[in-house]
């Protein structure tokens, strides 16, 4: 592997007072981090409406401005270093935001981040999206842009970062307060400070592919280095953290190794510092001893990728310390002219504030004036220590680097015709006030009930809505809500209208799922029993039909004339039912349509709901400068891609098989694109048609399904479908770029949704 790391000059190391025994390195092109870091700060503050300063660029004498990632990942691939820098600064700025935000604000940010991190390509995740303003959606676009940048560079390793970040997010945000020793503290702090994420960022940055089993083998050795990073971070961040705590009434106690030692070990602040100095040295020494032992087991040397991984862990320790010495993010006690801190009666305070306190003392002066031997002797003989350094100092590492022209004319005509009668139409509602009250009871509204999911959860257990409530408990990818939010980034629909449109689309989608499962004889939905298997076919048909009544009630809430909304809904629902009729006809008669007819069916069936969504959003849009823009070609391509991808994944995806069963479309007798291509090409067409025509109700025998899939592979139908999907992927991105240009804004959220569905 090429080397990009360069040793930091000896004179710079010497003047820094570095304690680490490892040799610090810096990226040979470390200056490329400066602009990404500054840009991320601006990007974050604009998205979050904050005025935070990351202070991640340290002015190191002899080097100039250096970002922590250039020291912690000195051998990072140059083309990946800017993206790593931006992501690291995002995590750091987010940490600062948590310090000033309310808990409900923090939880919302975390929820948005989790949604951005979820892998939408795997069925089974459960997401919820609430309608929001442009201000609310800006953070989501920022998060999506960061994830997208990493995925574009290396999707596999990027998803490892996202998975680790998602798993540790709650611990990183809300640290526990029941850790009494450093042995308890260190492992938790390692996660809290983002070092597990940093480990995946290292692999991404350097392009290292290390198996989970090899990472597990290396973990004890690497964790020792990570614990040393935590000690370094806690030592240098303590003055800032305790200052913030003491000056912020009601704030949480600092989650810091110094605090653990003072609160639960009975140590003074200087004693806690001395213990942590000794602990850093001990951790580094034990790391080297265990590394030597591991190498001996492996014949004297680890494989190159593993050696690079461990080497980076060492450089991260000393790099973290060198950066901490000079960064403005961590002013020293001397910089702050901060008195010694003590812990008395369950609270921290400055010694100068205590009764009979003497002169202010700066801890850095008192600690550094003691010889190393005195530090070690005092620690080893201290009666306050319940055990060894290991017992007292088990502190987890805290990394400082973690971060339609025709369509519009049509709508305009309708609006003009009904402008004078709009109020009358609304007054002459098709639904009586009594009926509307009944509907409101079945799907309640009110404070806190801002999403379709929350309204369903609050709905009564009435038979007419029970199948819908059941569907809401099943896993969902949430793609439609994300799609609506992403389009709204361009169209700027009022919040109440956006919420209503999401509800309408969700209602119609649920209705179609219930009816589809009945019409397709499906017994499973997302790995669970289909609704009609629980509530009965007749009851589910009634519930699905009742949804249309509720949709009419929701349409009345929109700001555009009711006649416009009803016209749009009627036209697109007609398309949906026409498409479904073709699909059912081909299945019942085992009739193989042409590829063109199949595409038209998808455009009607799948595209109907997408177009309904887009047209309602356009009708409610507050923008007047985009009336001549037409997103329908993009929507058509997206609909085709969604359905054909589903056809393909149903036959080849292990994840789909786990959720739905192997080749479930064949159980239903569905005429999908791979089946059409197979029947057009295979010499065994008569045999396959025979299997399909003589299929009995219920699942197809596994041997028959395996036979048909083998024939698909032999004749190239599956490969042709895959190639078609890959071409569609390129067309979708090209169409997205056109729309971004027309609307005048990038749409990272929409692109991320697309790319996570890609077929490789």
Swiss-Prot record:
Residues 14-335 are annotated as: Terpene cyclase. Residues 391-400 have a biased composition (Polar residues). GO terms for biological process: alcohol biosynthetic process; isoprenoid biosynthetic process; mycotoxin biosynthetic process. Mg(2+) 2 binds at residue 95. Dimethylallyl diphosphate binds at residues 525, 605-606, 643, 650, 660, 670. It catalyses: 5 isopentenyl diphosphate + dimethylallyl diphosphate = all-trans-hexaprenyl diphosphate + 5 diphosphate; all-trans-hexaprenyl diphosphate + H2O = colleterpenol + diphosphate. Residues 336-759 are annotated as: Prenyltransferase. Mg(2+) 1 binds at residue 95. Mg(2+) 3 binds at residues 516, 520. Pfam families: polyprenyl_synt, Terpene_syn_C_2. Its cofactor is Mg(2+). Keywords: Isoprene biosynthesis, Lyase, Magnesium, Metal-binding, Multifunctional enzyme, Repeat, Transferase. In the N-terminal section; belongs to the terpene synthase family. In the C-terminal section; belongs to the FPP/GGPP synthase family. This is Colleterpenol synthase. It comes from Colletotrichum gloeosporioides.
């Amino acid at each position: 592997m090429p080397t990009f790391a360069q040793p930091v000059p000896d004179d710079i190391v010497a003047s820094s007072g570095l304690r680490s025994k490892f040799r610090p390195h810096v990226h040979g092109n470390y200056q490329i981090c400066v602009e990404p870091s500054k840009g991320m700060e601006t990007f974050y503050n604009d998205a979050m409406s904050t005025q935070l300063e990351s202070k991640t660029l340290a002015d190191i004498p002899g080097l100039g401005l250096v970002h922590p990632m250039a020291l912690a990942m000195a051998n990072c691939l140059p083309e990946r270093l800017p993206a790593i820098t931006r992501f690291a600064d995002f995590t750091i700025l987010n940490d600062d935001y948590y310090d000033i935000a309310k808990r409900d604000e923090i939880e919302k940010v975390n929820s948005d981040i989790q949604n951005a991190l979820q892998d939408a390509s795997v069925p089974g995740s459960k997401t919820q999206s609430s309608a929001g303003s442009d201000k609310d959606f800006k953070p989501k676009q920022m998060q999506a842009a960061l994830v997208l940048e990493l995925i574009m560079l290396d999707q596999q390793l990027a998803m490892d970062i996202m998975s680790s970040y998602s798993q540790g997010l709650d611990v990183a945000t809300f640290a526990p307060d029941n850790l009494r020793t450093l042995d308890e503290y260190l492992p938790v702090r390692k996660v809290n400070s983002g070092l597990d994420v940093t480990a995946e960022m290292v692999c991404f940055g350097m392009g290292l592919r290390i198996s989970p089993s090899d990472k597990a083998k290396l973990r004890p050795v690497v964790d020792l280095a990570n614990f040393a990073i935590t000690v370094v971070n806690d030592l240098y961040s303590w003055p800032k953290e305790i200052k913030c705590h003491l000056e912020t009434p009601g704030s949480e106690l600092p989650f810091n190794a110094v605090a653990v030692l003072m609160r639960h070990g009975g140590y003074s602040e200087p004693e806690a510092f001395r213990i942590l100095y000794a602990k850093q040295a001990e951790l580094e020494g034990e790391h080297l001893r265990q590394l030597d032992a591991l190498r001996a087991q492996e014949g004297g040397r680890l494989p190159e990728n593993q050696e690079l991984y461990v080497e980076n862990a060492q450089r991260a320790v000393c790099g973290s310390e060198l950066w901490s010495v000079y960064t403005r993010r961590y002013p020293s006690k001397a910089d702050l002219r901060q008195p010694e801190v003590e812990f008395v009666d369950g609270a921290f305070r400055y010694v100068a504030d205590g009764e009979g306190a003497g002169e202010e003392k700066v801890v850095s002066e008192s600690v550094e004036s003691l010889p190393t031997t005195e530090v070690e002797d005092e620690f080893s003989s201290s009666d306050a220590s319940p055990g060894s350094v290991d017992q007292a100092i088990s502190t987890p590492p805290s990394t400082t680097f973690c971060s339609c022209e025709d369509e519009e004319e049509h709508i305009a005509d309708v609006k003009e015709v009904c402008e004078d009668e709009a109020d009358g139409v609304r007054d002459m509602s098709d639904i009586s006030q009594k009926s509307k009250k009944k509907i409101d009871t079945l799907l309640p509204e009110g404070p806190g009930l801002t999403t379709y999911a929350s309204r369903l959860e609050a709905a009564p257990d009435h038979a007419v809505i029970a199948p819908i409530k059941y569907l809401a408990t099943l896993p969902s990818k949430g793609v439609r809500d994300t799609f609506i939010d992403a389009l709204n980034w361009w169209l700027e629909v009022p919040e109440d209208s956006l919420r209503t449109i999401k509800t309408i689309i969700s209602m119609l989608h649920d209705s179609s799922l219930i009816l589809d499962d009945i019409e397709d004889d499906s017994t499973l939905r997302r790995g669970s029993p289909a609704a009609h298997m629980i509530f009965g076919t007749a009851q589910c048909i009634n519930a699905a039909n009742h949804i249309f009544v509720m949709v009419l009630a929701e349409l009345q809430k929109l700001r555009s004339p009711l006649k416009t909304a009803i016209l749009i809904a009627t036209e697109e629902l007609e398309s949906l039912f026409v498409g479904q009729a073709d699909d059912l006809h081909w299945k019942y008669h085992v009739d193989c349509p042409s590829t063109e007819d199949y595409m038209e069916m998808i455009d009607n069936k799948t595209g109907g709901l997408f177009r309904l969504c887009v047209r309602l959003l356009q009708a409610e849009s507050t923008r007047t400068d985009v009336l001549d823009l037409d997103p329908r070609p993009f929507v058509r391509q997206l609909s085709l891609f969604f359905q054909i991808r589903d056809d393909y994944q149903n036959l080849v995806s292990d994840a789909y098989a786990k959720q739905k069963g192997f080749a479930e479309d064949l159980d239903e007798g569905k005429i999908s694109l791979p089946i059409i291509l197979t029947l057009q090409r295979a010499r065994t067409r008569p045999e396959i048609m025979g299997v399909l025509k003589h299929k009995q109700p219920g699942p197809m025998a596994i041997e028959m399904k395996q036979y048909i899939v083998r024939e698909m592979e032999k004749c190239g139908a599956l490969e042709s479908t895959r190639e078609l999907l890959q071409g569609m992927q390129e067309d979708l991105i090209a169409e997205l770029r056109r729309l971004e240009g027309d609307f005048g804004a990038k749409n990272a959220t929409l692109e991320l949704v697309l790319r996570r569905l890609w077929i490789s």
